[in-house]
Each structure stands twice: as C-alpha cells, then as structure tokens.
C-alpha cells in the first residue's frame, strides 16, 4: 500500500 508512483499491495 505505497503512496508513490506505483501502488504496491500490502503483504
């Protein structure tokens, strides 16, 4: 759940 350029899923 990153709030950067790309949103990655939280693991």
Curated annotation (Swiss-Prot):
It holds the Pfam family Periviscerokin. The modification Threonine amide is found at residue 11. It is found in: Secreted. The keyword Transmembrane helix does not apply. Its main location: secreted. GO terms for cellular component: extracellular region. InterPro entries: Periviscerokinin (IPR013231). Signal peptide: none annotated. Transmembrane segments: none annotated. Keywords: Amidation, Neuropeptide, Secreted. GO terms for biological process: neuropeptide signaling pathway. Belongs to the periviscerokinin family. Mediates visceral muscle contractile activity (myotropic activity). This is Periviscerokinin-1. The lineage of its organism: Eukaryota, Metazoa, Ecdysozoa, Arthropoda, Hexapoda.
